[in-house]
Amino acid sequence: MTQPLFLIGPRGCGKTTVGMALADSLNRRFVDTDQWLQSQLNMTVAEIVEREEWTGFRARETAALEAVTAPSTVIATGGGIILTEFNRHFMQNNGIVVYLCAPVSVLVNRLQAAPEEDLRPTLTGKPLSEEVQEVLEERDALYREVAHIIIDATNEPSQVISEIRSALAQTINC
């Protein structure tokens, strides 16, 4: 199986952490769309949003998704990538989409423990727990709609990777 694997889910679900280790375990290349975009523009996500608003960032995110999609690649996407209909169809039609699902409390705890998350622009201007709740309520149905595989991401990364690998084996063998 050489299809790209797209990891989707909200901030804090473990897309980058799991993605790097999953790519290593599958002997694949790993790309994080946000990191790729930041390296291409030499700007942080916050700087891109400040300069181009969310609309401009979303357009760049789509271009990044298309640019990094390649066989034998694990791609950690930005949490809002599913907001653009083109991106949802693109991922569904060009690879296997894995939704890393986690409850609000887990996401908030992870985000509070990661100081680099302070560099991310707020989506709602509300306190973190309210923002995570609101954003997840808005996006969960879209994550589920686009996903070929849904994984409980509350476990340790090694367990999440094991579950993804099992689900991939079942997907390929059906």
Curated annotation (Swiss-Prot):
Annotated positions binding ATP: G12, C13, G14, K15, T16, T17, R120
Subcellular location, record wording: Cytoplasm
GO MF terms, alphabetically ordered: ATP binding; magnesium ion binding; shikimate kinase activity
Metabolic or biological pathway: Metabolic intermediate biosynthesis; chorismate biosynthesis; chorismate from D-erythrose 4-phosphate and phosphoenolpyruvate: step 5/7
Catalytic activity from the UniProt record: shikimate + ATP = 3-phosphoshikimate + ADP + H(+)
Protein residues bound to substrate: D34, R58, G79, R139
UniProt cross-references to SUPFAM superfamilies, sorted A to Z: P-loop containing nucleoside triphosphate hydrolases (SSF52540)
Pfam families, per the entry: SKI (PF01202)
Sequence similarity: Belongs to the shikimate kinase family. AroL subfamily.
Protein name as catalogued: Shikimate kinase 2
Organism field: Escherichia coli O7:K1 (strain IAI39 / ExPEC)
Designated gene of the protein: aroL
